[in-house]
């Protein structure tokens, strides 16, 4: 869980921006989206191989 301590002279908007940035860096939202629905192991394997193909093609 991401935790932000708001400084004395820091505005709430800045604290929210820092929190969102920290969540994005730690991958909380992407992990949530990935686990939102059950994914069969065969589908996971297929997605992983397709991602590897895309990555190889881009290099």
From Swiss-Prot:
<dbReference type="InterPro" id="IPR038380">
    <property type="entry name" value="Ribosomal_bS21_sf"/>
</dbReference>
<keyword id="KW-0687">Ribonucleoprotein</keyword>
<comment type="similarity">
    <text>Belongs to the bacterial ribosomal protein bS21 family.</text>
</comment>
<dbReference type="InterPro" id="IPR018278">
    <property type="entry name" value="Ribosomal_bS21_CS"/>
</dbReference>
<dbReference type="Pfam" id="PF01165">
    <property type="entry name" value="Ribosomal_S21"/>
</dbReference>
<dbReference type="GO" id="GO:1990904">
    <property type="term" value="C:ribonucleoprotein complex"/>
</dbReference>
<dbReference type="InterPro" id="IPR001911">
    <property type="entry name" value="Ribosomal_bS21"/>
</dbReference>
<feature type="compositionally biased region" description="Basic residues">
    <location>
        <begin position="43"/>
        <end position="59"/>
    </location>
</feature>
<keyword id="KW-0689">Ribosomal protein</keyword>
<feature type="region of interest" description="Disordered">
    <location>
        <begin position="35"/>
        <end position="59"/>
    </location>
</feature>
<dbReference type="GO" id="GO:0006412">
    <property type="term" value="P:translation"/>
</dbReference>
<dbReference type="GO" id="GO:0003735">
    <property type="term" value="F:structural constituent of ribosome"/>
</dbReference>
<protein>
    <recommendedName>
        <fullName>Small ribosomal subunit protein bS21</fullName>
    </recommendedName>
</protein>
<dbReference type="GO" id="GO:0005840">
    <property type="term" value="C:ribosome"/>
</dbReference>
